[in-house]
UniProtKB/Swiss-Prot annotation:
This is Flagellar assembly factor FliW. Pfam families: FliW. It comes from Caldicellulosiruptor saccharolyticus (strain ATCC 43494 / DSM 8903 / Tp8T 6331). GO terms for cellular component: cytoplasm. GO terms for biological process: bacterial-type flagellum assembly; regulation of translation. It comes from the Bacteria. Its main location: cytoplasm. Belongs to the FliW family. Gene3D superfamilies: BH3618-like (2.30.290.10). The lineage of its organism: Bacteria, Bacillati, Bacillota, Bacillota incertae sedis, Caldicellulosiruptorales.
Length: 152
């Protein structure tokens, strides 16, 4: 089997060589970026952060994090409609990430726990899903919450 590779240009990483099998298709795009459908995940070395890099626009890359690393009790149920749309057949198919906003004052770094990015890693399909759950804020202040969790 021949694996197709292509070069993805990225403002953050320069040129990335990406296997077609690593490209994740977002049928509806990401809210506010609905025209962008193809993304690749790039891991930061020695960091809990990843990048969700658009394959179609070098200037669009989101910092993402596995929410379970910062909030071990994070949990939610996906409705059947989403499970079917992403063709999920087992929990092992699913990777969950949350978008991180890192402002100039890094102490104000926040994570969007309200709208996780759900990825079927086997089918390479993804979407950002808005949870109907008041436990999770749009702006979860990372350092403030990490400090309070350490003090407990």
């Amino acid at each position: 089997m021949v694996v197709q590779k292509s070069v993805v240009r990225s403002r953050v990483f320069g040129e990335l060589e990406v296997s077609e099998e690593n490209i994740i298709f977002f049928e509806e795009g990401i809210p506010a970026f609905e025209n962008l459908k193809k993304f690749v995940i790039v891991k930061e070395d020695q960091s809990p952060f990843y990048w969700l890099q658009s394959v179609e626009d070098k200037d669009i890359a989101f910092v993402i994090i596995n929410p379970f690393e910062i909030k071990p009790d994070y949990e939610f149920d996906l409705p059947d409609e989403i499970v079917n749309k992403l063709e999920i057949t087992s929990a092992e198919d699913v990777a969950v990430f949350c978008i991180v906003v890192i402002p100039e004052d890094v102490k104000q770094t926040r994570v969007n726990l309200k709208a996780p990015v759900i990825i079927n890693v086997n089918k390479r399909k993804g979407m950002q899903y808005l949870l109907d759950d008041e436990r999770y804020p749009l702006r979860y202040y990372l350092f403030e919450n990490l400090n309070s969790n350490v003090q407990k």
